[in-house]
Amino acid sequence: MTAEERSSALHVMVIGSGWHFTSGISHYTYRLSTALAGRCAASALLMRRLVPRRMYPGASRVGADLTNVGYPVHVPVYDGVDWYWGRSMTQALTFIDRERPDVVILQWWTGAVLHTYLRLARYAARRGAKVILEWHEGQDVGEATMPGTRQYVGTLMPRLLRYVGAHVVHSGFDLHNLTAAYQLGDAPVRVIPHGPYDHLARPAPARPASPDEPLRLLYLGVVRPFKGVEDLVAAFSTLDRAQAIRFRLMIVGETWEGWTEPDEAIARSPHADLIERVDRYVTDAELAGYFGQADAAVFPYHRSSASGPLQIAMSAGLPVVVTAVGGLVEATRDYQGADPVPPRDPAALGSALLRLLGRRGDRYADPHSWDRTVDSFCSLIDELRGRTPSAAARQHAAMGVDRR
């Protein structure tokens, strides 16, 4: 897009997480921004110092260079706003004035950004921008257990909602939770599926079945109470030795909230020698390596709205065993490689692990597409701006749910 074309095009600004506190939302913010940039002028305004470092569960790796992706030159970026504002907020407002977005899309996942989003949304809305709030979950579950945080979000969120013209969620599960939690008035709420994390993993070539090699199972993600990793270890431990020796289990991810039960379960497992544990947040290059080694991925969550690692596994085309909870049911509904199991059920999980032996080397097409995701966003944006959506946008928007 030339400078002249960019000046006359629809301009969408995505506001979300930056790389200083790298997370799945950092990658989503990046990927949505770059996908939108293929259709319109797009920019990104990032949160930099998300919270005081001492308060962050992954404090030891804050600021580390963990990613190998960067925003392209045609996507202007401000990186970014600090939790305590200072000059960073003044510069963010200047960035909004310079870019003059027609639409801003706020990525919501934590109450830590609420005071900042309230300021940015009010500023952008008063300058004529339409505001879309994209909900990844109502509030981080660990954060919600901290004294006063649930009340803080519940008190200030209605103020933010005054400036929001439309909402986006990733599943009917999230739609139900959102409409039960807040009065949204007549603002449209669109279900738009999570786009693929195809910048982190590519479809892996099918491997020929080799019964002499162990099947490599991968759990990758932060280890927290709701992730259910201890259930995976329990399921693996219930296999007899002849069964277990046919696998290698890789558990990769840093521990949050002091949740050591999975590591304790590994230590007492009769198959501990078959389990590799990597207790840190790995780089993008390492992540690609683990998914490249894996024959299958396992996600034993107790609850979840969405899962970045699950999206990566589907982008890689791997067989996945995933618990049928929350938004994961819809995320995997059209993925032929998914084997859903009930949560908190190591016996069912163990049976699913054994079924993977018959799917060794299989690869599957990821049903998710950024083209469809962007079509749905464009349809919603046209609606907010009082324009008629394109035929493609209307078609893909109709695949979701619109609640008014």
Regions from the PLM with identified roles:
Residues 289-305, 318:
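Acidic donor-binding loop of glycosyltransferase active sites
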Residues 161-189, 196-198:
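A short, active-site helix/loop in glycosyltransferases that binds the activated sugar's phosphate group
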Residues 179-180, 190-214, 387-388:
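Acidic anion/phosphate-binding donor-loop and adjacent secondary structure
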Residues 334-347, 354-358:
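Conserved acidic donor-binding segment of nucleotide-sugar-dependent glycosyltransferases
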Residues 16-22, 34-98, 254-258:
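N-terminal strand-loop element at the rim of the active site
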Residues 209-227, 233-236, 250:
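Conserved donor-binding/catalytic core segment of Leloir-type glycosyltransferases
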Residues 122, 126, 139, 149-167:
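Membrane-proximal helix-turn-helix segments that form the acceptor-binding/catalytic region
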Residues 262-285:
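Nucleotide-activated donor-binding/catalytic signature segment of Leloir-type glycosyltransferases, i.e.
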